A protein has these predicted regions:
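Intrinsic-disorder-associated, low-complexity terminal segments enriched in Asp/Asn/His/Tyr and depleted
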Residues: 2-3, 27
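Cationic, low-complexity basic patches in intrinsically disordered or flexible, solvent-exposed regions
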Residues: 9, 46-50
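Short, positively charged and aromatic/hydrophobic N-terminal segments
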Residues: 34, 55-58
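PLP-dependent amino-acid enzyme catalytic core
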Residues: 59-447
Length: 447
């Protein structure tokens, strides 16, 4: 048996295999048919010539036009560090010149690009001559789920395979890249767990400071992760909103740049790559239904932004999935507001749930989430903690995936919506598992 480095043939085979797997379009890897061996060899040989090492950026021009308030439309200068709108304190969105971007980024050119979120470089804000802060984020699998589906087509987008084992890596890669580029040296974030770990990792990679404020009852794995990655960790008696308030109180004197959810404009740009990847993996035919675990809602908001951009690029049509926000029964501000027909969500009192990513009593992007749910003819559903544990175990024992409680909540939601007739037979539904169950071991003790 040959080992790597023993003879030329296995070395070439390994190199071609790695190149082929990294650069083959995502929908081929996840959904499409296998290529014939001869075709695969020719494709691998061609793609090897075009291969881009993971740490090397594409020489793509930047098409960022402006920053614009998502509520009042006021423009802001993208050449400076920005937080919320200076007029109305609402989140800022990045606006791109999509007509110009479409000249260098097409569905065909994506075939030659590395399997990471930076494959969509033209619709990301970092200048072309600046290297991203990257740990290989993006390119996560889309897997068919058969156990719970019956005559439904159910898939899971497994974000636990990102660096730091959660979808938060997407947002932090882009946001830390931009913060460093614009001169920030000290970054701060309130976190229920996964955002803190992601900031700690990407700040370490970028050579900047990370200051993370977490509720004292955050799962221990998340706290240890942040500390071992070199971050300054402060534990607070309270919720994530209390952590955010402490950052707001101290950031001026400490020189911190606030990286809170939607309080800077670039985490959502990283999260929107969920939408681009999903469309690519589905061969540019969006699913009928998306079930998304919703705390701060950046992923849901980002995907909707991606769908609008892809339509402008001519990559997809006008069809949109019905978006369902899945929350915990013990912290369901979006569920309560949607059911009441409100445009904003009031702070949820006495918030509690084992799903730390869903324990967000007040989301700054609530008005955006509620607008998307209405536009998509989607809806909301709240899931009890006991159901999260039950479905996490069911998914693990039947599908081989150790999902986080937030992801498990989506499986419970799917079953409920299917039973209520809100997902029809034959429709394609996609569940997002936003993190690894390994980070929530405290939840499964003595259960």
């Amino acid at each position: 048996m040959y080992h790597i480095g023993q003879g030329w043939l296995p070395t070439v085979a390994v190199a071609l295999s790695a190149t082929f797997c990294r650069l083959l379009p995502l929908h081929r890897l996840a959904l499409g048919p296998r290529l014939r061996p001869a075709s695969a060899w020719r494709a691998a040989k061609r793609l090897q010539q075009l291969a881009v090492p993971a740490d090397v950026r594409f020489n793509a021009p930047m098409f960022l036009k402006r920053l614009e308030c998502s509520a009042c439309g006021l423009e802001h200068d993208p050449s400076r560090l920005q937080n919320l709108c200076r007029s109305c304190n609402k989140p800022l969105f990045t606006i791109f010149d999509l007509a110009a971007a479409s000249r260098t980024m097409t569905r065909a050119t994506l075939v030659t690009r590395e399997r990471s979120l930076w494959r969509y470089r033209e619709v990301l804000p970092l200048p072309a001559d600046v290297g991203p802060v990257s740990l290989g984020e993006g390119g996560t699998p889309l897997l068919r789920v058969r156990t719970f589906a019956d005559d439904f087509e159910l898939w899971i987008k497994d974000e636990s395979l990102n660096p730091t084992q959660s979808f938060k890596a997407r947002g932090m890669s882009v946001a830390v890249s931009m913060a460093k580029h614009l001169g920030a040296t000290k970054l701060a974030v309130p976190s229920a767990g996964n955002a803190g770990g992601a900031l700690a990792a990407y700040a370490a990679r970028a050579g900047v400071e990370a200051h993370i404020f977490m509720p004292r009852d955050t799962p221990r794995a998340n706290i240890v992760e942040c500390r071992e990655l070199g971050a300054h960790v402060t534990l607070i008696d309270g919720l994530i909103t209390d952590c955010g308030a402490e950052i707001a109180r101290r950031k001026g004197n400490e020189g911190w740049f606030d990286m809170s959810t939607l309080k800077e404009p670039y985490r959502v740009e990283g999260k929107k790559t969920l939408g681009y990847e999903l469309a690519e993996q589905c061969d540019w035919q969006l699913p009928d239904v998306i079930l998304y675990p919703t705390g701060g809602g950046t992923g849901l908001i980002g995907m909707w932004k991606a769908f609008d951009e892809m339509q402008a690029l001519g990559w997809i049509g006008t069809k949109r999935p019905r978006m369902f926000a899945v929350q915990a029964s013990g912290c369901a501000p979006i569920v309560r507001a949607f059911d009441a027909g409100e445009k904003d969500a009031a702070e949820y009192p006495d918030a509690h749930t084992i799903a730390s990513g869903l324990r967000v009593p007040k989301a700054i992007g609530d008005f955006l989430i509620l607008k998307i749910l209405g536009q998509s003819n989607g809806g909301v559903i709240a899931v009890a903690d006991e159901e999260m544990i039950r479905f996490a175990r069911a998914v693990g024992s039947s599908e081989g995936l150790f999902v986080c409680p937030e992801g498990a909540a989506c499986f419970a939601a799917f079953k409920s919506l299917r039973g209520a007739g809100k997902i029809a037979s034959g429709e394609r539904a996609i569940i997002f598992n936003t993190g690894s169950g390994i980070k929530y071991l405290d939840c499964y003790q003595d259960q």
